[in-house]
């Protein structure tokens, strides 16, 4: 499987924990009306909370205390496989890096002596260029396009080994860009300070992110339906969780809607969480077992 070589990685003096933005070429969705903002999916119930709370996790310990774990559970009235890599950011230096050309995730991870990897934000499938705001070493490498503005309401910064998730729009991008040398925009924002963010922020975000120039035709048809998903979260004790939910496997894992994903992030105990590029891009990797999940485009 090939990916675009724009990526992020985390590393310590001895070992690198790699967070990459390799992009798998996927289908482009057609448009739906902007007014259709209620995420489709199965209503969350107490049974869903219990299923997540009592999930049987298969775990594998990585270097410097990082843990890779996965589970197959029945939640939201559907089968789901959830894979997680959790680590302490105090034991790793975090960086955002943009690579020059296409390569396989595993190859790039090995080249950087990575401990683990996950895909990042959105990109242009024709050119490989980022389509969300990205600033590296104080230099802006990409701006959020109008087509991505509707879902780009969050960002992750990695300065001074402190991982933070922020709210993001056309106004905050300037402030964040001045404050942080390394920052990447993505979205939708799933959690902020323990509060689920998707429902209240989406209707307003499209106009904010593009200074009122976005249109309903920019929203991909099916965005709110169940798909493979990837996201990154921070727990109250500042542990980092990189998560992938497999999708498009009817009997194995159908994937989640954005609404279901924010519910999952909350149930996993996260304080802040940010959705990343999903679909065929959703990949979680570590240097002990290789690709942990089952990517499907």
Q: What would you call each of these model-derived segments?
A:
Residues 83-86, 154-157, 189, 230-234, ...:
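Short beta-strand scaffold segments in enzyme catalytic cores
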Residues 128-222:
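Active-site-adjacent helix-turn-beta-strand microarchitecture at beta-sheet edges
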Residues 98-103, 168-175, 245-250:
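Short, solvent-exposed aromatic-acidic interface loops
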Residues 1-49:
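Bacterial Sec-dependent N-terminal signal peptides
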Residues 44-167:
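Zymogen propeptides
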Residues 92, 161-164, 196, 240, ...:
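Hydrophobic residues embedded in beta-strands of well-ordered beta-sheets
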């Amino acid at each position: 499987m090939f990916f675009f070589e724009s990526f992020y990685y985390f590393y310590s003096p001895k070992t690198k924990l790699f967070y990459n933005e390799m992009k798998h070429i996927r289908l482009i969705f057609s448009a739906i009306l902007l007014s259709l903002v209620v995420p489709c999916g199965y209503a969350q119930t107490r049974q869903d909370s219990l299923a997540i709370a009592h999930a049987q996790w298969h775990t594998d310990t990585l270097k410097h205390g990082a843990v890779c774990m996965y589970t197959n559970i029945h939640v939201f009235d559907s089968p789901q496989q959830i894979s997680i890599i959790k680590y302490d950011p105090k034991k790793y230096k975090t960086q955002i890096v943009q690579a020059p050309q296409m390569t396989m995730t595993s190859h790039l991870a090995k080249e950087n002596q990575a401990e683990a990897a996950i895909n990042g934000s959105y990109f242009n499938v024709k050119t490989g260029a980022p389509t969300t705001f990205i600033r590296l070493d104080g230099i802006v490498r990409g701006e959020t396009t109008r087509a991505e503005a509707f879902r780009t309401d969050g960002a992750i910064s990695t300065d001074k080994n402190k991982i933070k998730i922020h709210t993001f729009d056309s106004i905050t991008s300037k402030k964040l860009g001045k404050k942080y040398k390394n920052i990447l925009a993505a979205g939708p924002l799933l959690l902020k300070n323990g509060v689920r963010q998707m429902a209240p922020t989406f209707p307003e975000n499209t106009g904010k992110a593009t200074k009122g120039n976005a249109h309903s035709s920019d929203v991909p048809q099916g965005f709110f339906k169940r798909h493979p998903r990837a996201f990154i979260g921070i727990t109250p004790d500042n542990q980092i969780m990189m998560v992938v939910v497999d999708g498009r496997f009817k009997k194995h894992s159908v994937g989640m809607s954005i609404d279901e994903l924010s519910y999952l992030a909350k149930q996993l105990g996260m304080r802040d969480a940010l959705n990343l590029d999903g679909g065929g891009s959703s990949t979680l990797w570590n240097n002990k077992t290789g690709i942990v999940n089952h990517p499907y485009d």
